[in-house]
Amino acid sequence: MSEISLIMLAAGNSTRFNTKVKKQFLRLGNDPLWLYATKNLSSFYPFKKIVVTSSNISYMKKFTKNYEFIEGGDTRAESLKKALELIDSEFVMVSDVARVLVSKNLFDRLIENLDKADCITPALKVADTTLFDNEALQREKIKLIQTPQISKTKLLKKALDQNLEFTDDSTAIAAMGGKIWFVEGEENARKLTFKEDLKKLDLPTPSFEIFTGNGFDVHEFGENRPLLLAGVQIHPTMGLKAHSDGDVLAHSLTDAILGAAGLGDIGELYPDTDMKFKNANSMELLKQAYDKVREVGFELINIDICVMAQSPKLKDFKQAMQSNIAHTLDLDEFRINVKATTTEKLGFIGRKEGMAVLSSVNLKYFDWTRL
C-alpha cells in the first residue's frame, strides 16, 4: 500500500458564495462542511497524515484531534505550499473541502492509476457547445478538472516553489514538465462555489440544535462622558469607566453571543491592552463579533437582557435599546427583550457605584436550505 498523506483546503473566504456564513462552515447535520468532507475522504484510505488549511485554527481544533491544522495563505497556492511543509510521504492527495461528496469509486480510480504519472486527476468531459470570445471550441479537447488529485510530493513542492499562481496541482506539475494522468470524474465531485450549487447536491440538512450563551459585565461609574447602553445615550455625563466607550450592555451581549458559538469571550477578541480599542464604539464591536459568529455557521434566535442599575431609571430607554440592537444585528425586534431592575439599594449597584448587565442568547445553525 502506497504511503499517501491528505491535504484538505479549507481556508478560503467564500467570496463567490455570497452569504454571511463561509461555505466551509455550513452545517451538514452537526458537522461543518469542512469536517464532513474530510471525514468522507479519510474513510477511504489509511492516510499517513491529514492536514487541513484553516483561517480559524483554534475554532476548528474543537471539532477533532485527528488532523493537523495550518493557517492558510492569501491564495490557494500559498495555502497548499504551507500545508506541504508538514508532508513527508511519497504521495500527497489534495482536495477542496467544497467538493463534499467525492465517491469511493472516484477515489479508487485515482489510487488504481497511481503509478501512471506524476499527478493523477479526475476530469469531466464537456457535453455542451462551448464558446470562447464567440468562437466555438473543440469540446473533445476540453476537460473540466476536479479534485481530489494525487501527486508525487517532491515534484509538487518543487512546482509550487516557482511562486506562480496555479489553480490546481495538475497545472503546477504540468508546468514543470511532469506527466498528468486523467481519470473519469463525476458530477458529485463538482465544487460548491455559488449558493445555487447547494440545490445540485444531495447534502444532509443542518440539525435543529439550539446553543445558549450567557454574558455578564460590570462597570463602575466615574467618567465624565455619556452613559451609553446599546449605543443609546442614557445620560450626558454619568459615563462608566472602561477602555472602550463603556457600553456595559453591548459588552455583556457580545460575550453571550461569542459564548453560545464557542468562540471565546470579548476580552480575547478585543483586549483592553490594545490601544486600537481605546474609546471604541462597543456596538460596532458587537456587530463585528456577530459577523464572526455568522461566518462559522450560526444565526441568532432571540436575545434577553437584564440591566441592573439603581440609577438612572431606564424605563423610557428600553424601546430605543431594543431597536438599536435589532438594527445592529440585523434581527427582528420581536426577538429582542431588554429588562431593567434595581437591587433594592443593596450592594455596589444599590449604592450607585456602578451597573451590571446579564445577557442570554440562543443561536441555531444557519439554515442554508432557505437560500
Swiss-Prot record:
Region (2-C-methyl-D-erythritol 4-phosphate cytidylyltransferase): 1-210
UniProt site (Transition state stabilizer): 16, 23, 243, 342
PROSITE patterns for the chain: ISPD, ISPF
Pfam families referenced in this protein's UniProt entry, alphabetically: IspD, YgbB
One function term, GO molecular function aspect: metal ion binding
Binding sites annotated in the UniProt record for a divalent metal cation: 217, 219, 251
The keyword Transmembrane helix appears for this protein: no
Superkingdom per UniProt: Bacteria
Keywords linked to the UniProt accession: Isoprene biosynthesis, Lyase, Metal-binding, Multifunctional enzyme, Nucleotidyltransferase, Transferase
Entry-linked SUPFAM superfamilies: IpsF-like, Nucleotide-diphospho-sugar transferases
Residue segments, region 2-C-methyl-D-erythritol 2,4-cyclodiphosphate synthase: 211-371
UniProt-annotated binding residues for 4-CDP-2-C-methyl-D-erythritol 2-phosphate: 217-219, 243-244, 265-267, 270-274, 341-344, 348, 351
Essential cofactor(s): a divalent metal cation
HAMAP family associated with the record: IspDF, IspF
Role: Bifunctional enzyme that catalyzes the formation of 4-diphosphocytidyl-2-C-methyl-D-erythritol from CTP and 2-C-methyl-D-erythritol 4-phosphate (MEP) (IspD), and catalyzes the conversion of 4-diphosphocytidyl-2-C-methyl-D-erythritol 2-phosphate (CDP-ME2P) to 2-C-methyl-D-erythritol 2,4-cyclodiphosphate (ME-CPP) with a corresponding release of cytidine 5-monophosphate (CMP) (IspF).
Protein name, entry field: Bifunctional enzyme IspD/IspF
Name of encoding gene: ispDF
